[in-house]
Amino acid sequence: MGLVAAAATALVLAVTPVQFVQAHGSNGAFAETGGPADAALTSWAVLGLRAVGRLAPGSLAYLQSQEGLLQSTTDVALVALAEQALGAQPETLRARLRSATRPSGLIGESVNSTCWAVLALGQASRATTRYLLAQQAKGGGWSWAVGGQPDSNDTAAALEALRVAGVHGAPVTRGAKFLLSFQNRDGGFELTHGRGSDAQSTAWAIQGLVAAGRKPPRSAFAYLAKLKRADGSYRYSARYVTTPVWVTSQVLAALAKKPFPLAG
C-alpha cells in the first residue's frame, strides 16, 4: 500500500493527535496528505511522537538515508535532533555542525541556525554562547537573523539554546518576559505583533517558557484545545488549516511541556 493510501485508510480511525501523526507515516517516513515524504517533516513527527513517549518505527533508518541530501545548517540540526530522540548518536551530522562554526560563534547562516545547532550538539562553546547573548535585542527577544525584527519563535528557540548552554539570570528572564508579550486575549501566541495567534507559535512559546523555568499560561493550552479537530489534528489557527502533520507534531511536544533537545 502506498504512503497516501495508507494514510487515508488509517486516518479513518485516527481520533488522537498521536494517531493522526502516526497515520501519515509509512516505513518510517512522514508526509502531509497528498504530499511527498521528506526528512524535515519526518523529523518533526519523530520529535512530537517521542515527546509523548511513542515510538517511530523505521524513522531512524529513513532519516539516516537522507543525511547526504541535507543542505542547510538548520535541516542538519533538525534531523540530528530527531535521530538523537530515537536513541542514535548522529556524529556525522554533528561534525557538519561543528565545521559550520565560525570564530564569532555563529553556526551556519543565522541566529536561528545557531540556536538549532546548539540544540543538536547539546552544548555551546563560549564563543557561541557569547554570540547568542549578543544577539538579544534591547526588548529581550531574538530575531531569525542579525538586524531582524525579534519574534516569538526565534526567542523561544534562543531560550531553549541558552538552557543547553547553561545560561541563567537576566538574559533568560528578559527573554521570557518578551516572549509573554506575544500572547493574545484568546490565549494563543503570535509570531509577530499584530499577526494573530497560531498553534505553532503557541507551541514554541510553551517550550521556550519551560526552558526558561517559567510555567506556561494555562490559557495557552486552552487555546490549543480549541484548535483540535475531530480527526485528531490541530488547525494552524482559528482561520486556517494547513500542514496539519507538522502543526500537530509541534503541538505534541508542547503539550508534553518538553523543550528541545529531547532525551534519547
Q: Where do the PLM segments sit?
A:
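An alpha-helical repeat/solenoid feature that recognizes helix-turn-helix modules
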Residues: 31-57, 68-91, 106-130, 138-174, ...
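Short N-terminal segments immediately surrounding and downstream of signal-peptide cleavage
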Residues: 14-28
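Buried hydrophobic core positions in alpha-solenoid tandem helical repeats
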Residues: 21, 63-66, 97, 132, ...
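Extracellular loop and loop/strand-boundary signature of outer-membrane beta-barrel proteins
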Residues: 102-104
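Secretory targeting and sorting signals
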Residues: 1-14
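Alpha-helical repeat scaffolds
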Residues: 58-66, 90-100
